[in-house]
Amino acid sequence: MKTTEQLTDLFRERGLRVTPQRQMIFGLLQANDSHPTVESLYERAHAEMPTMSLKTVYQTVHDLEALGEVDVLDLGTGSLRVDPNVEDDHHHLVCTSCGRVRDLPLEFTGLQVPSRHRRGFTVDDVQVIFRGRCEECSN
């Protein structure tokens, strides 16, 4: 993920408002590989900056997604997750006990829709989600 300074410059270049609240969200995402929910980002940001609103967090995440700087994932956990790792192609491991989400490096390629089922369909993205229990929850 880009640095807070790079994201600040990008937002300004695109005519988007840059506020201390948004810069805090940039920083929280930059230092995070846990695929946080928008709500957990809000809780952390609000604890440090009481002027933070949930709407600001949602709007900032939406703008980051529109700029291609984060992916917003629905992993079936009940909350949308924010993935700041857009540089590396990867899939996800989701623990069904604790909800932890980890990146899984893309070690298998070539997954595609069989030609007899395509019927003119063009695949833009493939996301594979493995559900199970993490090491801590398995013990």
Segment roles from a protein language model:
Residues 2-15:
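Short, Lys/Arg-enriched N-terminal segment that forms or immediately precedes the first helix
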Residues 57-67:
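Basic amphipathic alpha-helical segments that dock to polyanions
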Residues 20, 31-37:
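Short capping segments at the starts of secondary-structure elements
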Residues 40-46, 57:
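A short acidic, leucine-rich amphipathic alpha-helix
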Residues 66-139:
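Non-DNA-binding regulatory cores of transcription-related proteins
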Residues 23-28:
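Pre-recognition alpha-helix immediately N-terminal to the DNA-recognition helix
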